[in-house]
């Protein structure tokens, strides 16, 4: 057993410590804490996943949190740590000392999530699946859930549904919740689904479990509504239980508001990894033509619904791989909001060949963002603006809004 003090927070929700055995990454540990445990080596590094905390950080959050909350610190103390993660990535990975605007806090530190997914526990109730494990962590409540999802959580704890998982998607705008039932037999779930709608759920769908990921298999409506409207700052957009939409709409709305003020406007704009096209629809009044590229059929379907509802005739959705953007030609603005892996080499190469006047880069991973920004700066761009945003309080995750210009 080793006893050691944690030095700093690093990406992934780990505290870093230097010991006689080498660097140890400690899950959920906070800077300055004294911990004890037996680190295990995996992927070439030492990890301690369940430390015994001997001396806690004075700001450690005292109330129970779900396992996903890997930054259990008083909220005001979380923000400088997250800002430091972005600054460190910018300096260490991108090799840049560009100014960083102060982090924008989440409007709500708790009760902010409008989407969540839980496993059904064999003993009843709902549980989190622990990462890289088959272990289930049973929950009595989840303080990260916004209303009305907190109501839905309490209802579902008492329903013995024959499913593997339940997924929730709510709307702060409408005050409603959609429910996804994952696994089980859809025919046997039709009657419970109708009863759940009578109980207060806006709609229920069934989803086939898939090794490819969440809602990658067959999805069948069972009862009630299929979509809801949610407000993301100045924009109202469609969400569904199977959609990949921002789970903190108040924070996402603030980012959209600021993004709109950063760009020049012009003739043509392109959004890669568009999802349902929030940026395309938001910026459509500033450009003559806007093209939204997205690979997900469901996201494109919702984007088209919103485009028609908003009357955005100059927006065009294309269901295609972002790596094939070369075929679309030149644009004044390219918006990119890639997954955590960042931009693939094909997209970075396209940007450096097409040379749009502006690149609006939104990231959910500071390290891959910094890698891509460094490559674009070496290719002739300058980082004109960057600001961290906190979409996920009580977790290590941090978003970045940035603008590059020629």
Swiss-Prot record:
E.C. number(s) listed in UniProt: 2.1.1.-
Keywords assigned by UniProt, alphabetized: Methyltransferase, S-adenosyl-L-methionine, Transferase
Active site per database record: 364 (nucleophile)
Pfam families, sorted: tRNA_U5-meth_tr
GO biological process: rRNA base methylation
Binding site for S-adenosyl-L-methionine: 246, 273, 294, 337
Enzyme class of the recorded protein, top EC level: transferase
GO MF assignments: rRNA (uridine-C5-)-methyltransferase activity
PANTHER family, per database record: RNA M5U METHYLTRANSFERASE (PTHR11061), TRNA (URACIL(54)-C(5))-METHYLTRANSFERASE (PTHR11061:SF30)
Family to which the UniProt record says this protein belongs: Belongs to the class I-like SAM-binding methyltransferase superfamily. RNA M5U methyltransferase family.
Protein name as it appears in the record: Uncharacterized RNA methyltransferase TT_C0988
Organism whose genome encodes this protein: Thermus thermophilus (strain ATCC BAA-163 / DSM 7039 / HB27)
């Amino acid at each position: 057993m080793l006893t050691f003090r944690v030095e700093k927070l690093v990406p992934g929700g780990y505290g870093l410590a230097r010991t006689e055995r080498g660097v140890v990454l400690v899950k959920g540990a906070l800077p300055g804490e004294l911990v004890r445990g037996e680190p295990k080596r995996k992927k070439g590094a030492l990890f301690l996943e369940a430390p015994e905390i001997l001396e806690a950080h004075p700001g450690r959050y005292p109330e129970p949190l779900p396992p996903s909350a890997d930054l259990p610190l008083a909220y005001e103390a979380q923000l400088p740590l997250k800002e430091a993660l972005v600054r460190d990535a910018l300096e260490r990975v991108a090799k840049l000392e560009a100014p960083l605007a102060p982090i924008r806090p989440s409007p709500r530190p708790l009760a902010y999530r409008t989407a969540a997914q839980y496993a059904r526990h064999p003993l009843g109730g709902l549980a989190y699946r622990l990462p890289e494990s088959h272990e289930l962590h049973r929950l009595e409540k989840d303080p990260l859930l916004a209303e009305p999802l907190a109501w839905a959580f309490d209802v579902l704890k008492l329903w013995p549904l024959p499913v593997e998982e339940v997924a929730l998607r709510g709307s702060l705008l409408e005050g409603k919740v959609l429910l996804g039932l994952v696994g089980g037999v859809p025919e046997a779930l039709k009657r419970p689904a109708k009863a759940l709608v009578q109980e207060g759920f806006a709609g229920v769908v069934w989803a086939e479990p898939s090794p490819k990921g969440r809602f990658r298999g067959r999805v069948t409506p069972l009862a009630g509504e299929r979509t809801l409207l949610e407000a993301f700052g100045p924009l109202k957009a469609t969400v569904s239980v199977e959609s990949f939409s921002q789970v903190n709409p108040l924070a996402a709305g603030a980012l959209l508001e600021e993004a709109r003020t950063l760009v020049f406007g012009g003739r043509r704009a392109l959004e890669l990894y568009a999802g349902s096209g929030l940026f395309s629809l938001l910026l459509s009044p500033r450009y003559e033509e806007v093209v939204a590229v997205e690979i997900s059929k469901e996201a494109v379907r919702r984007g088209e619904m919103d485009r028609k509802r908003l009357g955005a005739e100059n927006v065009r959705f294309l269901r295609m791989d972002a790596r094939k953007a070369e075929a679309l030609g030149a644009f004044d603005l390219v918006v990119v909001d890639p997954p955590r892996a960042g931009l693939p080499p094909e997209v970075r190469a396209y940007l450096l060949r097409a040379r749009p006047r502006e690149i609006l880069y939104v990231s959910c991973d500071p390290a891959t963002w910094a890698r891509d920004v460094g490559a674009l700066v070496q290719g002739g761009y300058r980082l004109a603006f960057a600001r961290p945003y906190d979409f996920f309080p009580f977790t290590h995750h941090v978003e970045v809004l940035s603008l590059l210009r020629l």
